[in-house]
Amino acid sequence: MALDQVRIASRRSQLAMVQTNWVKEELEKACPSIDISIEAMATQGDKILDVALAKIGDKGLFTKELEAQMLIGRADIAVHSLKDLPTNLPEGLMLGCITKREDPADALVVNKKYKNYQLNDLPEGSVVGTSSLRRLAQLRHHYPGLIFKDVRGNVITRLEKLDSGEYDCLILAAAGLTRLGFGNRIHQLIPSEISLHAVGQGALGIECVKDKEEILQIIKVLEHKESSLRCLAERAFLKELEGGCQVPIGVNSKIQGQELILTGMVASLDGKQLIRDTKTGSSMHPETIGIELANTLKSQGAMEILEVIFKEARA
């Protein structure tokens, strides 16, 4: 029997709905005879807004509820910001598609009184808002004179807090700002020499039930080969380090000709220890490159740094 419907599970945040509606529209163009619907829901990460993400300590903060809908047969696929999708997926589910990546860089967004400053000349004591340990650790490493303060809520809420003076500047994903129509708020794209981005940042991951070949064929129309190869290398790197979404692990990847170049880093929360290295290999074997880079960082002390962080999280 031919497939006549696809049910998409999505977070109900504004950014998630923009992303999921884009997937819906693209699938409708490719498969006009199929009825495509969205079931939006709140996840644990959406509900707990008074605790720093790192202190909640769950690798599936923004994905578990969506995955549950697929596992009980109420949804066929789930659309995620790939950076939020853990590298270990529940039994019976798979990462079926990675979409074309937006710019994965982190962005500096400033209160208007800071419009004449760049990141490297912010006055000492400036208050920088970020909910990411990865950004926090790298920026502490390079700019120990800045004050870092946790910020939660959706992008609009965060921008309101910035503009009200609660923060002097924020560090946010450029891709999310662009997708929400706030690209004009990007004051500076932070160079990768300063801040390596999150694994999968800027790409969408479409998760689906294993062994549903018809669903897999449909979503594969959105697959972007180069983005997929880069993100698979990054995810293999993260998985080998046993890291989740809330650890100070960063990456940068690019493909030149037939080669994939992957840079990765692990840092302590205070920014005083930062290990960084690069591996190059065939783009046809992205996961091998990720694993090799992780092992290189392990040999330089990465696991000792991460174990301290894991121990603090368990305390």
Swiss-Prot record:
The protein's annotated catalytic reaction(s) are:
4 porphobilinogen + H2O = hydroxymethylbilane + 4 NH4(+)
Biological process per Gene Ontology, one example term: protoporphyrinogen IX biosynthetic process
Pathway info: Porphyrin-containing compound metabolism; protoporphyrin-IX biosynthesis; coproporphyrinogen-III from 5-aminolevulinate: step 2/4; Porphyrin-containing compound metabolism; chlorophyll biosynthesis
Give start-end of the signal peptide.
none
The record's SUPFAM superfamilies line, in alphabetical order, gives:
Periplasmic binding protein-like II, Porphobilinogen deaminase (hydroxymethylbilane synthase), C-terminal domain
InterPro entries assigned: HemC (IPR000860), Porphobilin_deaminase_cofac_BS (IPR022419), Porphobilin_deaminase_N (IPR022417), Porphobilinogen_deaminase_C (IPR022418), Porphobilinogen_deaminase_C_sf (IPR036803)
EC class (word): transferase
Q: Does the keyword ATP-binding apply?
A: no
Give the CC-aspect GO terms.
cytoplasm
Required co-factors? dipyrromethane
Q: Which UniProt keywords apply?
A: Chlorophyll biosynthesis, Porphyrin biosynthesis, Transferase
According to its UniProt record, the EC number is 2.5.1.61
PTM-bearing positions, type S-(dipyrrolylmethanemethyl)cysteine: 245
Q: What's the domain of life for this entry? A: Bacteria
> What does the record note on quaternary structure?
Monomer.
Question: What NCBIfam families does the record tag this protein with?
Answer: hemC
Function recorded in the entry: Tetrapolymerization of the monopyrrole PBG into the hydroxymethylbilane pre-uroporphyrinogen in several discrete steps.
Supply any other comment: The porphobilinogen subunits are added to the dipyrromethane group.
Similarity field: Belongs to the HMBS family.
Name of the protein in question? Porphobilinogen deaminase
Organism of this sequence: Prochlorococcus marinus (strain SARG / CCMP1375 / SS120)
Query: Upper lineage ranks?
Result: Bacteria, Bacillati, Cyanobacteriota, Cyanophyceae, Synechococcales
